[in-house]
Amino acid sequence: MMPPPFMPPPGLPPPFPPMGLPPMSQRPPAIPPMPPGILPPMLPPMGAPPPLTQIPGMVPPMMPGMLMPAVPVTAATAPGADTASSAVAGTGPPRALWSEHVAPDGRIYYYNADDKQSVWEKPSVLKSKAELLLSQCPWKEYKSDTGKPYYYNNQSQESRWTRPKDLDDLEALVKQESAGKQQTQQLQTLQPQPPQPQPDPPPIPPGPIPVPMALLEPEPGRSEDCDVLEAAQPLEQGFLQREEGPSSSTGQHRQPQEEEEAKPEPERSGLSWSNREKAKQAFKELLRDKAVPSNASWEQAMKMVVTDPRYSALPKLSEKKQAFNAYKAQREKEEKEEARLRAKEAKQTLQHFLEQHERMTSTTRYRRAEQTFGDLEVWAVVPERERKEVYDDVLFFLAKKEKEQAKQLRRRNIQALKSILDGMSSVNFQTTWSQAQQYLMDNPSFAQDQQLQNMDKEDALICFEEHIRALEREEEEERERARLRERRQQRKNREAFQSFLDELHETGQLHSMSTWMELYPAVSTDVRFANMLGQPGSTPLDLFKFYVEELKARFHDEKKIIKDILKDRGFCVEVNTAFEDFAHVISFDKRAAALDAGNIKLTFNSLLEKAEARETEREKEEARRMRRREAAFRSMLRQAVPALELGTAWEEVRERFVCDSAFEQITLESERIRLFREFLQVLEQTECQHLHTKGRKHGRKGKKHHRKRSHSPSGSESDEEELPPPSLRPPKRRRRNPSESGSEPSSSLDSVESGGAALGGPGSPSSHLLLGSDHGLRKTKKPKKKTKKRRHKSTSPDSETDPEDKAGKESEDREQEQDREPRQAELPNRSPGFGIKKEKTGWDTSESELSEGELERRRRTLLQQLDDHQ
C-alpha cells in the first residue's frame, strides 16, 4: 500500500485536517447546481473502460456534495505492489498497459489497462534512468503545516529545511533528460519517423516509493470558476452521451467513441508520433508556441491552433480537450509564478533603491517618501500594500545600519582617544580630568580630528577613566615588583645569617646550651649580622633562638645515639665519673661527629643524675634494711623469756640470744650493746611513769571513768579491760600558742622520743603507743623529706620524664609504705574508748588501784599482740 503523501517523516507532526476533512487551503471549489435536464454523474457500466472522472481507485473530484479526497490511491493501486509483483515474476509489465492521463485539477495520473488500476505515481516501467535514480534517493520532499517544504532521509531518519545536494543533482539530471525528450519530440513532429520498440524498463527497487506532497496537492492559487467550467464540460457531455445510448454496457461504452470518431477532423499533414505521450506533448507545445493564455476557452484556442499540423497529433477530441485542460492548468501555474517573480523583482528593486538613496534615513516618514519618490516608476510599479511592507523593511534595515555605523564610529573614536592618551607623557595616574582636557586641546592630533571632537563626552570620560586605571595598575605593579625585590633581598640576608650560625655550630662556638649574651661579641662583628638590622620579619635574635631550639629538639635522638655508643664501648656513668672521660669515650665513635656539644653535655648531666639517684636509693635501701634489723633485735629483747629486768648486764644475757637470727643480722657488737641499752632506758621510763601516776586526782577520774564507760562502744566489757595501764598513758599535751616558733613541734617530738627512751626504749609497749599516738606528727614531717629530695632535681630536659627516675621514685614510695605498716599495725591494738578519750582530753582515765601483777599481765598481752601483727 502506498503511504499517504501527507504523512510527514518521524519527528514532525502530521498535517491532518480537522474532523477528517482536507485542509481549507486545499479544498476544491464547490460544484454549482446542475442545470435542468442534467442528471448527476453515475458510475460507468461494468466491463467498460473507466471514464476520466471514474478511474478505478479514484473518487470523482467533481461529484456534487462531495469534496476531493486527500489520498485517492487504494491499497490495490499502490505502485510498490506492482513493482514488487513484477520483480518477483522476473518480467515487468509492458509499456503498452500503462497510459498517462490528466485529472481535471491538472494532476497527471497513470492507468493500467490490464488490472484496471490507477496510480498517481509514475510506474517504474515508464521512468527513465535518471527518474529511477531519483526514486531510489533516500531524500524526499514534504511540506509542513505552514506549506514550507522540508526534506527527510528515510535511511538516516534526518530532517532538514535546506535542499540536499544529491537531490538537486538527480533532479537536474531528470530535467536534462526531459529537455532532450522534448527536442526529440519536436524533431519527430517536423520529421516523422516510424515507431521504434521501447526498451525494457530498468529494474525497480523493492518497497513503496513515497509521493511528494507537491504532486498530490492542488494549486491553491487556481480560480474556482475555471476549475468548475473545466470539470463540468466533460462531465455533462459524458452523462448526456450515456443517457442517450442503449441500456447495454457495451453500447454505452462504444457510443461516445463512435461519436467522437464521427466528428470532423482536420486534415493530417502526414506527421506521426511514436506513442501517445509524444503526441500529447506535441499538442501542448503547439499551444505553448501559439501563446494560448490560461484563461482562453476551447473555441478561442481552436482558432489559434487549428491551422497548425501538430493539431492532428491527437486523433480524438477528448484527448485534445484533456491535453488542453492540462496545458491550461500548467500555464496558469506558470503565469502565476511569472507574476510572482515579477512582483518579487519589483519589490527587491524598490527595496534596493530605497536602501541606497541618500535622502532615506531611519526617521523618514512614509508620506515624505511618497512625495519624494511618487513620480518614479520603481515606486509606482509596486502595489501600495506591498510598498508599505517594503518601506518598513527598509526602515528597519536603515536603523540597523545607522546603529552599526554609530557603533563603529564610537569604537573608532575611543581607539583614537586611547592612542592619543598613550602618547601623552604628561598624563600620569594622578592627572585629573580637567587637566587631561587641557592637554587634549593642546594636542595637534586631537585638534585636527573633527569626529574626535564631536565624540560623546561620556565616552571620552569613560576612556579617560580606563586609561587612568591602566596607569594605576602599572604603578601598583611597579610597586609590587619593588616589594618583591626587597623581600627577596631580606630573604637572602636571613639565609646568609643562617649560614653564619651554621659556621658557628661547626666550629663549636654555638650549641644547644649557648646563650645570646655569650655569642653576641662574635656575632655582632660580622657583616651578615649588620645586613639583618632594620629589616622587618625575624630578627637575628629570633633566628638564634630558633637555631638553638632546633638543636635542643635533637636532644632525644642524639641521647639515644650516645647511649648506643656507651653500650658498644661498655662504659657506664657513675657518681665519680668526670665529663672529660665521658667525652673521650664518645669521641672514638664516628657517629659522634654529628652530635651537638651542648646535647652531649646535657646527656652527661642526665646520666650523672641517674647515677646519683641510684646511689641515693642504694643508701636508703641500706638504711631501711638496718632499721628492720634493729626492729627485729628489739623485738627479740622484748620477747626474751624470762623477761629482762632493770640492771641486767649485756654480757649476762648475750649467750641467750647468740643463736637467734636477729642477733646474727647485727654484725657489729657495739650496735648490739647500743640497742640493748636503749631497750633498758625505755623499760626504766615505763616503770617510773607507772609509779608517779598512782595517786593523781582519783575522784575526778572516777567521774570521767563513769562517763566514758557509758559512751564506750563495748559496754559489756569491764573498765579494767578497756583502759590501758596508767604507765602506758602519754602525758598531757600542752596547747601550742600560734605565736610560738615553728621549731617547737620538732623539739616536743624530740622530747617525746627521749622520754620514750627513758621509759625503756623503743621495744617497750609504751614506746609503741607513743609512736602510734604521734603518727600524725610523723606524717607532717614527710613533706619535708620530699622537699629535700626536690633539691637534687636538675634542669635537664629528661630529669622529669626519665623512666629510670620514675622507677626509683616508685620503689622509694613502696619502701615508705612498708616502713609505715609496722607503725599503723599498732593502732588497732588499742581499745576504741582509749583512743577516742585520748584525742578529746589527752588525759589518762584508768584506775590507779591496779596492782603491779595486773599491770605486768596487761603489758605482756600487748607485747604478744604486737608480735602477732608483726
Curated annotation (Swiss-Prot):
Localization of this protein: Nucleus speckle
Ranges where the FF domain occurs: 276-330, 340-397, 410-470, 490-550, 554-610, 625-682
Keywords of this entry: Acetylation, Coiled coil, Isopeptide bond, mRNA processing, mRNA splicing, Nucleus, Phosphoprotein, Repeat, Ubl conjugation
Claim: Repeat is one of the keywords in the record: yes
Glycyl lysine isopeptide (Lys-Gly) (interchain with G-Cter in SUMO2), cross-linked positions: 175, 837
N6-acetyllysine PTM positions: 148
Stretches the record annotates as Disordered: 146-277, 690-870
Pfam families according to UniProt: FF, FF_PRPF40A, WW
Domain WW: 92-125, 133-166
Coiled-coil stretches: 604-640
One GO-annotated biological process of the protein: mRNA cis splicing, via spliceosome
Compositionally biased intervals (Pro residues): 192-211
Biased composition regions of type Basic and acidic residues, renumbered to the chain: 804-824
Extent of Basic residues compositional bias: 691-711, 778-794
Modified residues (Phosphoserine): 764, 831, 851
Biased composition (Low complexity): 182-191, 739-756, 764-774
Protein's UniProt keywords contain Transmembrane helix: no
Entry similarity comment: Belongs to the PRPF40 family.
Protein task: May be involved in pre-mRNA splicing.
Quaternary assembly: Interacts with the N-terminus of HD.
Protein name as it appears in the record: Pre-mRNA-processing factor 40 homolog B
Phylogenetic lineage: Eukaryota, Metazoa, Chordata, Craniata, Vertebrata
